[in-house]
């Protein structure tokens, strides 16, 4: 069985945001699968998706801090600057982390590790929403 849809993630400020619960609420079809795979793809070039530590908020703060050190804004060597100081660094950060993730589904639930969560990584300052393409493939209950 296949399921495909788009979902909107609204009003995430710049930073690393745990969205596992939001995904589970907006994609209740996960519960219908005995076994399968969930693929999430973000339809933007200045935000990304990743899976990482879900328990300690300081992990999110550390990610933002070190990504900003690795890929600083206002670098005089950037040529693509017409959309603001945060735009080109956002493209680079997005390329480093990636735009899609795949997660196993088992017995109607995401089969993440104990400390794993899904992150939306927002690399721009003033974004109101992001669109994710959701595809599930598997065997239903």
Predicted feature descriptions by range:
Residues 1-141:
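Active-site histidine-anchored catalytic micro-motif
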């Amino acid at each position: 069985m296949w399921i495909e849809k788009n979902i909107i993630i609204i009003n995430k400020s710049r930073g690393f945001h745990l969205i596992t619960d939001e995904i589970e609420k907006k994609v209740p079809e996960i519960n219908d699968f005995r076994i399968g795979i969930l693929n999430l793809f973000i339809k933007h070039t200045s935000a990304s998706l990743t899976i990482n530590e879900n328990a300690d908020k300081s992990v999110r703060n550390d990610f933002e801090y070190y990504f900003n050190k690795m890929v600083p804004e206002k670098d005089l060597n950037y040529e693509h600057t017409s959309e603001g100081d945060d735009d080109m660094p956002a493209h680079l950060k997005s390329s480093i982390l990636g735009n899609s993730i795949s997660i196993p589904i088992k017995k109607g639930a995401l089969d993440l590790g104990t400390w794993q969560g899904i992150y939306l990584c927002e690399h721009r300052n003033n974004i109101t929403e992001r669109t994710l393409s959701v595809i599930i493939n598997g065997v239903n209950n």
